[in-house]
Amino acid sequence: MQTLFPEAPELHDSILKAYGDHYIANSTSDAWFEGISELLHDLKAQGLKLAVATGKNRRGLDRVIAKTQSTHLFDVTRAANETRSKPDPLMLQEILTVTGVNVEQAVMIGDSSYDLEMAQRLGMPRIGVGYGVHSVDVLQKFQPLTIAKNVQELHSFLRGYAQLSTVDVA
């Protein structure tokens, strides 16, 4: 909210509530992209720590996690209403503290400039996915390790990325 409406901090709570109510009332699907469930299960089976750093509020995040039956996959989750908003890196710092992972051993996977800027500001390696919010051109500005065109390409890249200890998904 600080990024979108910096001039009206007194309205942030009411805007978030209105957005959340509208999103819930009009959401047709909280499913993941095809292949994400398999990817997450594979990463977890490798012993990696998985985390979520989202712009959603806790209510929205919990709804998605419940619908996708993925509670067991994530070591920690952070929602926008629990910490500073993206692109402030505090959300990622909190995740690293909880997991005990060094920033160099983590990677942020994101589909928006806010995700990649947040990781860049912290010095965290980052991967863009070009099938989400922002275009490849926008994501490229944040110097990601790669930009995956689809989930299969992301999965293939992560298999070869040896220094991984934790994965943060946005």
Where are these regions (language model features)?
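Flexible glycine-rich beta->alpha loop in the catalytic core of nucleotide-sugar glycosyltransferases
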Residues: 125, 132-134
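Substrate-recognition "cap/lid" segment bordering the active-site pocket of phosphatases
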Residues: 29, 57-108, 113-122, 136-140
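Short acidic-hydrophobic, aromatic-tinged amphipathic segments that line or gate anion-handling sites
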Residues: 146-150
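A metal-dependent, Asp-based hydrolase signature
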Residues: 1-24, 34-44
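Short, acidic loop-to-helix structural element flanking the phosphoryl-transfer center
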Residues: 25-52, 58-65, 89
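As written
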Residues: 124, 143-144
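Glycine-rich phosphate-binding loop signature in dinucleotide/nucleotide-binding domains
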Residues: 45-48, 98-105, 161-165
